[in-house]
Amino acid sequence: MRRRQLLTTFLGLSGAALSLWFPAAARAEQTAGAVTDLLGREVRFEKAPERIVVANYILNFLMTGGGDALKKVVALPQDGWEATRTGEYKLLTQAFPTILSLPSIGGYHDNILNTERILSLRPDVVLVNIAQYRENAQRLAVLERAGVKTVVLDYHAMKPENHAASTRILGKLLGREDAAEAQCRRYEEALKDLQTRIASLPEEKKHRRVYVECGNEGVGRLGNSYNRTILWGAILEELSAANIAADMKAPYAPLAREFVIASNPQTILIAGSIWRNAAEADSMRMGLTVTEDEAQKRLAGFAARPLFEKTDAVRTGDVWAVDHGSLRTIADYVFPQFIAKILYPDVFADLNPDEEIRTFYRNYLPEVNPDGVYCLRAAATGAKR
């Protein structure tokens, strides 16, 4: 029963049901000159905002608004962006060099915004995520009294209703409602397709044992795994996989090596990005700007970890890498698609999520080259899907 309920929550419903399913706090119920943000706050505008501070989700902002929307941006959180989303930062600054000249207002890592700087820029609105809003409640109240609006978005929770609501808000604010609606419609359709197909499978074809790990710590140290409520763990839950970390008390934490080996995963997923940290030399790299050769070399190190040869996943060559950096966007429905193809290759053979995400960029952000590696199987056992 629980899995069925969660499956509905994650994978979405038909368009008619969605309007009833989204809670009021998460709906983008738009009226003329107003949006209802992700905390249920109605924010009214006398005119369309022309000066915008984007304190988070710049990629989503551009995906929905298009490249011209950058002309309205007066500041970004430049601190830490390059170090934790290197590929994204490189491609966006190449495509839109004016980003480099935008002032930084902080808040990328610690969520603390420089409200004095924001106030000096005279924006019409500040776009923040939920954590930033809560950390800066008093500071943002000062901005509100000065006439600067605050709108809260959320792509972090990985909830379809929040993804869609946030995207519709951006469409409303940027005069791109048609683009936003098309993006939300494709997102909902793609996830509902997964739901329908998996629901029709017999139980014996489900519940494959899976270990997922964030590969930012490198080969020598196990990185975070995820319980059933968050990020990759939530995706596995909704795809009816048996995530070995599903019952972990913390939303995310490293598992003990002995526990992983004893659990004998049938599939191993290593989530990669480009991180600038102490483990940079052998951390898993995936995503924008990453080449297949580089990703394969790094994935080979994870597949060759001591004692992991005892697992079914390594013995059968079911070791994969997925792109961690592209989660938390309106295009991230491709990652449930990728993993569905891994878990149920015959059922989802017709899907091509790699082409799907590239087409998304071509349609909505053609200035950005989406070349990179999004999902990859260890080279000794097969090619990418």
Model features per residue range: what roles?
Residues 2-7, 14, 18-62, 178-213, ...:
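Bacterial Sec-exported substrate-binding components of ABC uptake systems
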Residues 29, 106, 158-174, 181, ...:
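Structured C-terminal subdomain patch of bacterial secreted/periplasmic proteins
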Residues 53-55, 74-77, 125-129, 150-153, ...:
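Structural recognition of the beta-strand scaffold that forms the well-ordered cores
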Residues 54-55, 60-120, 125-132, 139:
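A short, structured surface patch at a secondary-structure boundary
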Residues 58-61, 79-82, 125-126, 131-135, ...:
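Solvent-exposed loop/turn segments at secondary-structure junctions
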Residues 81-87, 109, 132-138, 153-166, ...:
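Extracytoplasmic ligand-binding site segments that recognize negatively charged/polar headgroups
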Residues 224-251:
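Alpha-helical, coiled-coil/dimerization segments enriched in small aliphatic residues
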Residues 244-251, 256-258, 264-289:
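Pocket-lining segment of extracytoplasmic ligand-binding domains
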